[in-house]
Amino acid sequence: MSDINTARLPLSSPMLLPCVGDDILMV
């Protein structure tokens, strides 16, 4: 799942950045 979040990071807007960032930090 982390791979999907990482791939979405550049595609998603900065608004989702903090949400995805939290997931990456947890992993």
Curated annotation (Swiss-Prot):
InterPro entries for the chain: Amanitin/phalloidin (IPR027582)
Residues excised as propeptide: 1-10, 19-27
A GO term for molecular function: toxin activity
Cyclopeptide (Leu-Pro) crosslink location in chain: 11-18
Positions of disulphide bridges: none
Post-translational modification: Processed by the macrocyclase-peptidase enzyme POPB to yield a toxic cyclic octapeptide. POPB first removes 10 residues from the N-terminus. Conformational trapping of the remaining peptide forces the enzyme to release this intermediate rather than proceed to macrocyclization. The enzyme rebinds the remaining peptide in a different conformation and catalyzes macrocyclization of the N-terminal 8 residues.
Keyword terms: Toxin
Function noted in UniProt: Probable toxin that belongs to the MSDIN-like toxin family responsible for a large number of food poisoning cases and deaths.
Family per similarity comment: Belongs to the MSDIN fungal toxin family.
NCBIfam families reported in the protein's UniProt record: amanitin
Protein name listed in UniProt: MSDIN-like toxin proprotein 7
The organism of origin for this protein: Amanita bisporigera
Organism placement in taxonomy: Eukaryota, Fungi, Dikarya, Basidiomycota, Agaricomycotina
